[in-house]
Design a protein with these regions (language model features):
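Periplasmic-binding protein-like
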Residues: 7-12
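Exported/periplasmic ABC-transporter solute-binding proteins
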Residues: 2-3, 14-15, 19-25, 36-38, ...
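Active-site phosphate-binding/coordination module
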Residues: 30
């Protein structure tokens, strides 16, 4: 985008990047909004590994590697470390942590078995109200800062009516909300609702 790539819209994994795009003159002022709120999950490709006890998983002798996105680069990594701190489990992952450059690489570590478990985005392993494979536990949202994912209309799309309509669809459409919910995104929910719905 900084180098002039012909993109009309940016859908970011955080709120900072769209705000920065506007501040640097690449995004249209007044257009950033939160299109989704990400959820953090402790997930394993092993269908029997993860129950509802994060400490038991991380302290398990069977868990030699725990994948986490680099907290300096990825909001989900930052959320994972906040969760560990909130639960007093920082020492449980010492010597076990495998850092991914982004949440996609972190997911691949776990999916391929290079890490027995990992903190990833719920949307990576969840569809239509259930885990697609493996086992997971949705981390209660009160253990980490909300992962707001913002969208922004870029300057190159300022006169693109299709781009504006798409952003309006994301922001206002019940259909867009249903799609987000099906993949584990949405607006902030209470801990009780998350536990009842996803666990």
């Amino acid at each position: 985008i900084k180098n002039g790539a012909p993109f009309d819209i940016l859908l970011a994994a955080d709120a900072k990047t769209p705000a920065k795009a506007v501040a640097e003159g690449h995004g249209v002022a007044g257009t950033p909004f939160t299109y989704a709120v990400g959820k953090l999950v402790l997930w394993s490709s092993d269908a029997n590994l993860v129950k509802n006890d994060v400490a038991a998983v991380l302290n398990s002798a069977n868990v030699k590697h725990v994948a986490i996105a680099n907290p300096k680069l990825a909001p989900y990594g930052e959320a994972a470390y906040q969760t560990l701190k909130s639960l007093g489990l920082e020492k449980a992952v010492e010597g076990k942590t495998v850092l991914g450059d982004n949440i996609g690489k972190t997911y691949q570590f776990v999916k391929t078995g290079n890490a027995e478990a990992g903190f990833i985005a719920l949307s990576q392993c969840f569809k239509d109200g259930k885990f697609v494979s493996g086992s997971g536990y949705v981390i209660p949202q009160d253990l980490y800062s909300e992962i707001k994912q913002d969208a922004v209309l870029l300057k190159k799309g300022e006169n693109n009516e299709g781009a504006k309509r798409f952003l309006k669809f994301l922001k206002e459409s019940q259909e867009a909300t249903a799609i987000r919910d099906a993949y584990g995104y949405g607006t902030a929910r209470s801990r009780a609702e998350l536990t009842e719905r996803y666990c």
